[in-house]
Regions:
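Conserved C-terminal guanine-recognition region of P-loop GTPase G domains, centered on the G4
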Residues: 147-163, 173
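Hydrophobic positions on the alpha1 helix immediately C-terminal to the Walker A/P-loop
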Residues: 46
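Inter-lobe coupling/hinge region of RecA-like P-loop helicase motors
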Residues: 207-230
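Extreme N-terminal, non-catalytic leader segments
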Residues: 1-33
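P-loop/Walker-type NTP enzyme "switch/lid" segment
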Residues: 26-31, 35-41, 52-124, 210-218
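Inter-motif core of Ras-like GTPase G domains
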Residues: 122-141
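Beta-strand-loop-alpha "switch" segments that mediate conformational coupling across diverse proteins
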Residues: 176, 186-215
Length: 242
């Protein structure tokens, strides 16, 4: 009988956490992974805008685009964002080990990982090095199933690391409160037993900002969309106890 995908991931996490590379840093960055196993949940939008919001508080921030689709890298390519970024796709365990070494060599205050939406190296690397995992989830049943798998991986990593890390912040994403699903999302995601952060709503300003190659704080400062991101940044710092 074929094993369940979540069980497969858990086994991979165990092997990866106790693999050859040990994660040590001279001056540790705070590593925030934005991760879900399903695409279309607003992951890159959250990663880019959160990175820029954190940089606005005079903190050094590095964004690592680990998704082979390169959405974050395309956004960065316009040169209009206040953060540095690198394209470092994660496709296999070797890529995950390379990411661990790369992050350990950085001196930024924050390293944001825009993880790919598939099972494998992304979940393993996040489990090994992240201080906090943000899990964007839309108001759809498919997203809720994918979120359960991510939460299971996070808990497995906590057990193996024996440090309470990574912490988890579930972020309702692309939410439209006019719909029944949008109104019920907060209640639904609480079932995972992890901290639920402020919602990032479905707003055209995010789409327009991407088209302009800007982050929301420059494109539409003090807008409702910008408020979503500032509220998320506050929740992130609270989760990290900053």
């Amino acid at each position: 009988m074929a094993s369940h995908p979540v069980s497969q991931i858990a086994g991979q996490v165990t092997r990866f956490l106790f693999g050859a590379t040990r994660y040590t840093q001279r001056d540790p960055a705070l590593v925030i992974a934005v991760l879900n196993l399903k695409g279309g949940c607003g992951k890159s939008t959250i990663a880019i805008n959160l990175a820029c919001e954190l940089a606005g508080s005079s903190e050094s921030v590095l964004l690592l685009d680990n998704d082979s689709q390169g959405t974050a890298s395309h956004w960065l390519s316009h040169g209009r964002l206040p953060v540095q970024g690198e394209f470092m796709p994660l496709e296999n365990d070797e890529d995950g080990e390379r990411l661990v070494r790369a992050v350990a060599a950085r001196n930024e205050r924050y390293v944001i990982l825009d993880a790919p939406a598939h099972v494998g190296a992304a979940a393993l690397a996040a489990g090994k090095i992240a201080d906090l995992v943000l899990v964007p989830v839309t108001a759809s049943g498919v997203d809720l199933v994918a979120t359960r798998a991510v939460v299971d991986v996070i808990r497995q990593a906590r057990t193996l690391r024996r440090s309470g890390a990574p912490k988890c912040l579930i972020v309702p994403s692309k939410i439209d409160r006019r719909t029944d699903a949008g109104r019920r999302i907060d209640e639904q995601v609480r079932q995972f037993g992890e901290t639920v952060g402020p919602s990032v709503h479905q707003r055209t300003a995010f789409v327009d900002a991407f088209g302009a190659g800007q982050w929301i704080g420059d494109f539409a400062p003090q807008s409702a969309a910008h408020y979503d991101i500032t509220a998320l940044a506050v929740a992130v710092k609270r989760s990290l106890r900053i």
